[in-house]
Each structure stands twice: as structure tokens, then as C-alpha cells.
Swiss-Prot record:
Keywords: Cell junction, Cell membrane, Deafness, Disease variant, Membrane, Non-syndromic deafness, Tight junction, Transmembrane, Transmembrane helix. InterPro entries: Claudin (IPR006187), Claudin_CS (IPR017974), PMP22/EMP/MP20/Claudin (IPR004031). One of its GO terms (molecular function) is identical protein binding. The chain crosses the membrane at residues 8-28, 82-102, 116-136, 163-183. It is a multi-pass membrane protein. Residues 196-228 are annotated as: Disordered. It comes from Homo sapiens. This is Claudin-14. Disulfide bonds: none annotated.
């Protein structure tokens, strides 16, 4: 029962991490900067994500533009794209494997493959969390270095966006959930199919042979009236 509860907790945390990873990948709030004008109506906020960059006006208007050229993007952005996409794919595969391997499901019930699927799902969740952690950590380091670079003008400096914080939380949930899924399968005994005990067989190899009297005593019977003489000797003894 405790192992089942640990599996459910691990799957729930991993599933939340997968959802957070998807949202982090889509949101444009990876880098943000704010330029406030002389009037509150002229306040503008710039946002940059993996797939688009947006401009938010104080009037509530969003204007987003998708990146047109892939080769024109910086290398850190291209690497973050690849890492986050792979992390999302691994999270989806891990979710399917974990559903099959959990004890509360009927898929592959009573087979050793069920434990294998649970361990595989936990391992993939851990790998997905690591990839997401690397992507958001790399981007955060790049943002911090550029922010404290005195050679860059203030208009080109960005701050850490909300999507990076969400990425850290999501990757942590995936790592914790995947670890719980793997640990919940360690205490289980290996599956062994039931084997009926062998039946007792009767062997005649050690039984004693039937007793047979010697041939000399075959005719050693009590004398009858017709075959015995008056002296008590049998007539057959003289034949």
C-alpha cells in the first residue's frame, strides 16, 4: 500500500512538472525589460521567448511576432529550443510508461513488464527534468551576465522572466516525481511464476522380489492317504 501511494505521489508531481514544462516552452516570458516613459500611457514592456518576441503596452495591447529566421537566432536560444522540445517529448513518453507501470492500473497486470515500465517512466521523467533545468539555467546565466555587462547599452539588457521561474519549478517537480517512481519499485520482489510441486511417483526399483521357494521343496507336502505306506514313507520317494 505504501509503495502504491509513493507511485501516485511521484506520478502526480511528474505530471505537474510535464505541464509546467510545456507552458514554459510556449510562453514568451523568458526575458523581459520595462521602459517607462514620461507618461503612464507610454509605458512599454518587451518580452522575448523561444519562439516569439512580444511588446506589451500599458493600454493592454499585446503585439507578438514569431522569429522569421532560425539561423539568425543566437546559439543559446537555439540550444534552449532543442532542449525544451526534447524535454517535452520525453515527459510525454514517460507519462505513458508510468501509467502502464503503476500498480493501480490494469495494463500488463501480473507481469514483470509492469515494474519495468514504472522504472522506465521514472527514469525518463528525471532525464526530462534535467534537460529543462539545463535550458533555464543556461538562459538565466546569459541574462545575468548581459545585465551586468557595462559594454551593453541599457536598452539591450533584459531581466529574468516569469517563464524561467516556472521552468525551475517544473524541472524540480519532474526530478522529484521521477525519483519517487524509481524508488517505489526497489522494494518489490522479482516476479516468479507459480510452479506446482512435483507429484510423488511410486518406483519399484527398490522393492524386494516376491519370495519363491526352492525347487527341492516344491513336493514337500503332507502325505496323503493314497500315497503313503503303512510305515509312514511316501511312495513318491522311491519312484
Amino acid at each position: 500500500m505504501a509503495s502504491t501511494a509513493v507511485q501516485l505521489l511521484g506520478f502526480l508531481l511528474s505530471f505537474l512538472g510535464m505541464v509546467g514544462t510545456l507552458i514554459t516552452t510556449i510562453l514568451p516570458h523568458w526575458r523581459r525589460t520595462a521602459h517607462v516613459g514620461t507618461n503612464i500611457l507610454t509605458a512599454v514592456s518587451y518580452l522575448k521567448g523561444l519562439w516569439m518576441e512580444c511588446v506589451w503596452h500599458s493600454t493592454g495591447i499585446y503585439q507578438c511576432q514569431i522569429y522569421r529566421s532560425l539561423l539568425a537566432l543566437p546559439q543559446d536560444l537555439q540550444a534552449a529550443r532543442a532542449l525544451m522540445v526534447i524535454s517535452c517529448l520525453l515527459s510525454g513518453i514517460a507519462c505513458a510508461c508510468a501509467v502502464i507501470g503503476m500498480k493501480c492500473t490494469r495494463c500488463a497486470k501480473g507481469t514483470p513488464a509492469k515494474t519495468t515500465f514504472a522504472i522506465l517512466g521514472g527514469t525518463l521523467f528525471i532525464l526530462a527534468g534535467l534537460l529543462c533545468m539545463v535550458a533555464v539555467s543556461w538562459t538565466t546565466n546569459d541574462v545575468v551576465q548581459n545585465f551586468y555587462n557595462p559594454l551593453l547599452p541599457s536598452g539591450m539588457k533584459f531581466e529574468i522572466g516569469q517563464a524561467l521561474y516556472l521552468g525551475f519549478i517544473s524541472s524540480s517537480l519532474s526530478l522529484i516525481g521521477g525519483t519517487l517512481l524509481c524508488l517505489s519499485c526497489q522494494d518489490e520482489a522479482p516476479y516468479r511464476p507459480y510452479q506446482a510441486p512435483p507429484r510423488a511417483t511410486t518406483t519399484t526399483a527398490n522393492t524386494a522380489p516376491a519370495y519363491q521357494p526352492p525347487a527341492a521343496y516344491k513336493d514337500n507336502r503332507a502325505p496323503s492317504v493314497t500315497s503313503a505306506t503303512h510305515s509312514g514313507y511316501r511312495l513318491n520317494d522311491y519312484v
